[in-house]
Design a protein with these regions (language model features):
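NAD(P)H-binding glycine-rich loop region in Rossmannoid oxidoreductase-like domains
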Residues: 35-97, 103-106
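N-terminal Rossmann NAD(P)H-binding glycine-rich loop of SDR-like oxidoreductase domains
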Residues: 4-24
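Mid/C-terminal beta-alpha module of Rossmann-like enzyme folds, strongest
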Residues: 216-276, 302, 311-353
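Conserved Rossmann-fold NAD(P)-dependent oxidoreductase catalytic core, especially the SDR/UDP-sugar
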Residues: 83-148, 164
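Conserved glycine-rich Rossmann-like NAD(P)H-binding loop of the short-chain dehydrogenase/reductase
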Residues: 26-34
Length: 353
């Protein structure tokens, strides 16, 4: 039975990867600091929790033991993290290091954490220029996240070991934080009958389902190598299409009001607003043999059900307060009252599920 060791295995990506590997007959050890955070479904499926601190090399080496067929690092944020991973990777058949679309820059040097949004004219391939590496900035900051990821990537890619760097887009699934779909789920639960969307709901920010990441990681496990791979969903729905998907899954009907530039600033915003599409090219992963687990609609459904069930039990997402900017009902109602039934500032469609 092949063995996998997942560093940071109780989080979004680790949970999905562990479940997929367990279903495929792997022995999976999930490394984390707090056993109380071990998802119950992983334990039920046969996963084993190993208590260790990712920052403690002695503990992670003990967790690896005599080696693993697959090593997955969901917590590699800096060059120092990457260097501490190398002794583990040297005793693993295939290693996956999670990275991000945040490393990419457009022709003007802008990136997804820039004050000015980037403009990528075409889907982003793995050979697109990246930010310069940095080790002297906080990886938890907007300015430091991408440069530190680049520095970490360079360490593992130059090691000569079979390490695959996986650059994900905006991730979603059970356990995602932030759970961006809450901006729409909450609106449904509140019984809103009208949905206002800025930029006519045309914003596109490519998503990456944790289930699709897990599928790619399993593919890499059987095809070790030193490479960089993008990972994103097989479709890239717009903000309008995402809202329709969520409302449809929850059986909710509302009128859509698609706002143009004459509408008040800030009205109709969603977490997927972007003046220019941000889409990853995933043809390299496909060529390797990756087959996604599903589209956005099919992979987001379990997370939607989990959000609704938790809300009905009185449990909101931990970061629910950060979504208030998308749920300004008073401003929406005032705009609709001023509109007086006309379509000034936008146009309406019929009810959508």
């Amino acid at each position: 039975m092949p063995r996998a060791l997942i560093l940071g295995g109780t989080g979004l990506v680790g949970r999905a990867t562990a479940l997929r590997l367990l279903e495929s007959g792997w022995r999976v050890d999930v490394v984390g600091r707090d056993p109380d955070r071990m998802p119950a479904e992983l334990t039920a499926a046969g996963g084993k929790f190993v208590e260790a601190d990712r920052a403690d090399q002695a503990q992670t080496r003990a967790a690896l033991g005599s080696g693993a067929d697959l090593l997955v690092d969901c917590l590699c944020f800096t060059a120092a993290d990457a260097r501490s991973l190398l002794p583990l990777a040297a005793n693993s058949g295939s290693t996956v290091v999670m990275s991000s679309r945040a490393v990419y820059v457009d022709a003007a040097g802008r990136h997804v954490n820039s004050d000015v949004p980037p403009h990528f004219a075409t889907p982003i391939t793995e050979d697109r220029p990246t930010l310069a590496p940095a080790t002297d900035t906080d990886h938890r900051s907007r300015e430091g996240y991408g440069p530190n990821k680049v520095a970490a990537e360079q360490v593992v890619l130059e090691s000569g070991l079979p390490v695959s760097v996986v650059r994900a887009s905006r991730m979603h699934g059970i356990g995602a934080s932030p759970a961006r779909e809450w901006a729409v789920v909450k609106r449904v639960l509140d019984g809103r009958t009208i949905l206002l969307l800025a930029r006519r709901g045309a914003g596109i920010v490519h998503g990456t389902a944790a289930a699709n990441l897990a599928a790619l990681i399993e593919t890499i496990a059987h095809r070790p190598g030193t490479r960089v791979l993008n990972c994103a969903d097989p479709d890239a729905p717009s903000a309008l299409e995402i809202c329709r998907t969520i409302a449809g899954h929850l059986g909710h009907v509302w009128e859509e009001v698609l706002l143009d530039d004459t509408a008040p600033a800030g009205l109709g915003r969603t977490p997927w607003d972007s003046p220019h599409p941000i889409v990853l090219d995933t043809s390299a992963a496909t060529a390797l043999g990756h087959r996604p687990a599903g589209t956005y609609a099919t992979t987001i459904a379990p997370a939607l059900d989990r959000l609704v069930d938790a809300a009905r039990r009185g449990r909101r997402p931990a970061d629910a307060d950060s979504f208030t900017e998308y749920l300004d009902y008073a401003a929406e109602d005032a705009f609709l009252a001023r509109r007086g039934g006309s379509l000034t500032g936008g146009s309406a469609t019929g009810p959508r599920r």
